[in-house]
């Protein structure tokens, strides 16, 4: 009797992506972003010694991030979502490497991690729309915001603690410690595009062509104003709070 028997290899079966899947991804991502959010303005002020120049630096980086966000659909069509998400995780980690140089060019390059955050946000929202049913969307978003609350509540405090007690390497090392597990978690979930959703045959090449259609709809304008106002508040809080405390 033959003793060489090939037994089947049992691959781990993953359950379909649900609300907890995206809540866990967003929570780890939030920790990677929130931990350093309160340290960046302090480090920029230590380099520039002027609050106004720090504001100008943030404005320049924000405009660069906005330009990349507008062209993110082109990148997704060219390289696929999973690779754009992967690039976003790596940009968070690489940005921290630039921060530890404690120089103005390194600060500017590190703050460009906002492009990675944009890639993560857009691709994650696309995955959510593919895998979460419309009837479950409210519950999924509530769970996602609730889990990220822990990151944005404790993350900035953790970053300041590490920066003041253990130095710049510890604060930025925490970002890498969250960004790399985020990448591993994403590939563990094996998220893919919903095969039942097919892209349209005619797609605008220029993303700016859709701005007029967006502005023409009152509900979209209101949603944008709410999101923009909230973003302005929290950005002001995280940037100027550490500077003037």
Residue ranges and their predicted role:
Residues 2-19, 191-226:
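Juxtamembrane intracellular "pre-TM" segments in multi-pass secondary transporters
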Residues 5-62, 221-227, 231-245:
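Helix-loop boundary and gating motifs at the non-cytosolic
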Residues 27, 105-120, 228:
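Hydrophobic core of transmembrane alpha-helices in multi-pass small-molecule transporters
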Residues 62-70, 152-153:
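Residue-level signature of mid-helix packing/kink "hotspots" within the transmembrane helices
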Residues 68-80, 163:
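Helix-to-loop junctions at the C-terminal end of transmembrane segments
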Residues 83-97, 176:
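Structural signature of the two symmetry-related core transmembrane helices
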Residues 113-148:
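Cytoplasmic helix-loop-helix junction between adjacent transmembrane helices
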Residues 171-188:
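Symmetry-related core transmembrane helices of the 12-TM Major Facilitator Superfamily/SLC fold
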């Amino acid at each position: 009797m033959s003793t060489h028997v090939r037994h089947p290899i049992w691959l781990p079966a993953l359950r379909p992506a649900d609300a907890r899947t995206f809540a866990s991804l967003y929570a780890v991502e939030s920790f990677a972003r929130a931990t350093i959010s309160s340290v960046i303005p302090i480090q920029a002020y230590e380099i520039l010694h002027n609050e106004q120049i720090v504001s100008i630096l943030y404005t320049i980086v924000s405009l660069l991030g906005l330009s990349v966000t507008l062209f993110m659909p082109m990148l997704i069509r060219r390289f696929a979502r999973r690779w754009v998400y992967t690039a976003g995780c790596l940009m968070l980690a690489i940005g921290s490497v630039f921060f530890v140089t404690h120089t103005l060019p390194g600060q500017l390059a590190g703050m460009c991690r906002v492009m990675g955050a944009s890639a993560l946000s857009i691709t994650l929202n696309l995955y959510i729309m593919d895998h979460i049913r419309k009837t479950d969307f409210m519950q999924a978003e509530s769970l996602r915001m609730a889990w990220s609350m822990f990151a944005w509540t404790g993350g900035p405090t953790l970053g300041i603690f590490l920066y003041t007690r253990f130095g710049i390497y510890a604060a930025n090392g925490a970002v890498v410690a969250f960004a790399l597990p985020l990448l591993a978690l994403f590939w563990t979930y094996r998220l893919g595009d919903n095969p039942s959703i097919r892209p349209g045959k005619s797609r605008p090449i220029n993303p700016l062509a859709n701005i007029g259609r967006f502005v023409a709809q009152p509900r979209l304008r209101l949603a944008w104003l709410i999101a923009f106002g909230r973003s302005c508040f929290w950005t002001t809080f995280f940037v100027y709070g550490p500077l003037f405390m």
